[in-house]
């Protein structure tokens, strides 16, 4: 059974880049795309991914709102969430950890670093 990664990202270029990096990594993980936080919540409840990469600033519902919903639900509270964001101030990092993120990953993306982080959370 392949692992599932949910990417919540409103920027099409970032979605395409993450998809490309995952394909090149040969992790064999299925990538599920959500373009905003509400879609991320809905798709997480539907698919129960193994890992969530969550942009913090998106339309409709942002990551700051979506993450507490996911962490407050028994179906998804166990899923590690990586804040995938351009917000890199120390207080932003602290806040993402306080709301339940396992990691805070600041954009711009370094493909090798991102894959290493994903491998860490997909390891059996």
Where is each model-derived feature located?
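Conserved acidic carboxylate
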Residues: 9
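Helix N-cap/capping motif at the beta->alpha junctions
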Residues: 13, 33-42, 63-66
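Two-component/phosphorelay signaling modules centered on CheY-like receiver
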Residues: 12-32
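Active-site beta3 strand of CheY-like receiver
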Residues: 47-53
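Alpha4 helix (beta4-alpha4-beta5 surface) of REC/receiver domains from two-component response regulators
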Residues: 19, 65, 88-104, 109, ...
